[in-house]
Each structure stands twice: as C-alpha cells, then as structure tokens.
Amino acid sequence: MNYSQLKPARLNLGWSQQQAAAHLGVTQAYLSMMERGLRSPASVAPRLMKVYGLSPTVLPVNEVRDEVSADTLAHELALLGYPGYAHLRKGGQAGNPASFLLTALGQRNLEARTAEGLPWVVLKYPDMDSTFLVREARTRNLQNRLGFTVTLGRRAANRSDLQPLEQQLVDSKLEKEDAFCKELNSAERKWLQGHSSAEARAWNLLSDLTPSSVRYV
C-alpha cells in the first residue's frame, strides 16, 4: 500500500487525524507517521480498506499458491466482487486481486466459469501492482496466460489504460504453445488448434475465449 493514498482517503471522508485514528484503532501519532511514510500501513491494511472504503489492491500481496480448490478460487473471486459469483460472497474477506489472479492463472485445471471471470479482475482493479504481476508471471512462466487475460479485458471494454501492462507482457512472450488454465486430452487439443480465438493464438495459447466472452464490463 502506498502511504500517499492515506491522507486523501481520510480527507475524502471529512475526518481529522484524531477522528480517523479512533475509527482505525490506532493513535493519532501513529496515523500521522503512516501518512508521512514513516510507518508501514501493512499491518492495518485490512482495517484501512474497510474504514476508508479502499480497494483491496491496498492489501499486502500474498504468496502465489500452486494448487487451490475450485471452490476456494470461486469464493475468492466472489469476495473481490465478481457479479457472476454473487451468491458465494458470504463469509471471509477479499484478498489482494493481484495475488488471486496469478494463483488462478497458475492452476492446471481452472474451472471454466472462474477462468471467464479473470479478465473482469483486470478491468475491476486496474491499479494492481503491475511490477509484481509481471515479475511473478515471468518467474512462473505465466506471462502468456496473463497477457491473454489482459488482452481480453482491454478489447472487451476498449480500455487503453491496460496497454502498458499488455506491452510489458508482449515483450517477454513465450513461444511454446500452452493451454489456458486447462490440461487438454488429445481430442481437445486438436479441436482447439483449429478453433482457438485470434486473441489466444496471438499469445500462443489454446482457448476459444474471446472479448465477447467477457461479462460484466
């Protein structure tokens, strides 16, 4: 979380430091130091998000997980506000969307409805830490999957603000053919080799997802 967000968020609520500190459960002196960048807000980030009404992008990025159940990922996407999973939103707190996105993209077999929701995450949270996203995607060889996700979102909503992130991923695109979050049998692979979308082929991926597949834009 960038400390420079704190003072504008407080002032937007019309609160003095003393009032905000009381809502946050910290001292005025501690809040003052956080607003000046002298103390890290990471330990109170969830409280800041709730009290100030900030985006979950302010939360610390968590470790990218390798194997996560389909139900867990669906619930986490619901907590981020995905309309398609509104019925799963009860219980729990949203995590950092960048951590969720990379975790989902790294799954060997991601549930199709969850995969369709990933471009929505990119559109909903354009302020995700792009440095973290690109670095971790490259580390895990996920840049093509992430790039495809960004392309789908950008074209579905005509969002030029996503082009810088997309270009960073283009610059490190992998040449090896991959499937989008799904292990394919030989019949599925053969079919998708002839029916993958232009956007997927541009990222050397096998997938029939298109910008028109992106919902809730």
Name each region found by the language model.
Residues S4-H23:
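Short basic helix-loop element that most often maps to the first helix and adjoining turn
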Residues K7-P8, Q18, A29-S32, P46:
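Residues within the helices of the helix-turn-helix
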Residues L24-S40:
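Recognition helix of helix-turn-helix/homeodomain-like DNA-binding domains
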Residues A42-P60:
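DNA major-groove recognition helix of helix-turn-helix/homeodomain DNA-binding modules
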Residues V64-D127:
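Helix-turn-helix/homeodomain-like alpha-helical modules used for DNA recognition
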Residues V121-V122, L133-N141:
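An accessory alpha-helical subdomain
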Residues R138-Q168:
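Small-residue-rich helix-loop
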Residues L162-V217:
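Charge-dense, extended regions
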